[in-house]
Amino acid sequence: KNKPIFVSLTNSYHGETIGALSVGDVELYKDTYEPLLIQSIQTPVPKDMSLEAAKEAAQKFEELCKNRSDEISAIIVEPLIQAAGYMHMYHPHFLELLRDICDRYDVHLIADEVMAGFGRTGKLFACEHANITPDFLVLSKGITGGYLPLSVVLTSNDVYAKFYCDYLEYKAFLHSHSYTGNALACAAANATLDLFEKDDVITQNKAKAAYMMEKLKEFEKLDNVLEIRQTGMVSVVELKGYSSDERIGLKVHQYCLEREVLIRPLGHVVYFMPPYVITYEEIDKMMDTTLEAIKQL
């Protein structure tokens, strides 16, 4: 079938090459390249982490599929957390509903777990929180622990079989990349995965995430905090009462940097996404210093 259209969520970000920019929805990154981008459609992301918001957003996507599923090839989502989209989070049930809708309307589900994959959300993959399997799973970052660049796309045997053929049939993908299957990067990935198993990283992460959640409650008491939220080892403090011109996130960043704590706010959103090797003492310093910074505003 000729189904050229990709759907993504509002507020989404998937990278900065042409195809990835085309399905993103963060103006800061894509506006300059708008004339070059591939056609895509955005459907609403759940407005918050509630079950009701998940159902409302899924209904919007189903309405889109009812009208245009003959044109839609796939929907791409960042499971549970929209990282560059101000660390917006939503309920896992949204992924369950998407999986069901995609199955019924013959639309592929692509899960971009470049950020969330390999333990960041409390399970090895974020999709596991919804007990779903996407048609395509995009992975990077955590697969090598950040030591070497490597990305991977996993797909199903069904998709693989569609392109499996004798050479002269020309159904297979005939393109490749210069560094595909880089042996050193793959060795780093294997070593990282060995450590995940040996050190039981997922269990350790769950304990550290629970500790971070307790620390996060101190921020909720502040008058200039709009909301706190957390998924796994991603904790977020969203500030209120400041204009964009005040560059409030930069002020928090500078205060912390002077005290040997490196954080990277997104506008008025301050978040913690530490490496898994962080100690409890380092969590204390990271979050206590940031708390002091916000109190100083």
Language-model-detected regions and their locations in the chain:
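Conserved N-terminal phosphate-binding loop of PLP-dependent enzymes in the Aspartate aminotransferase
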Residues: K1-L297
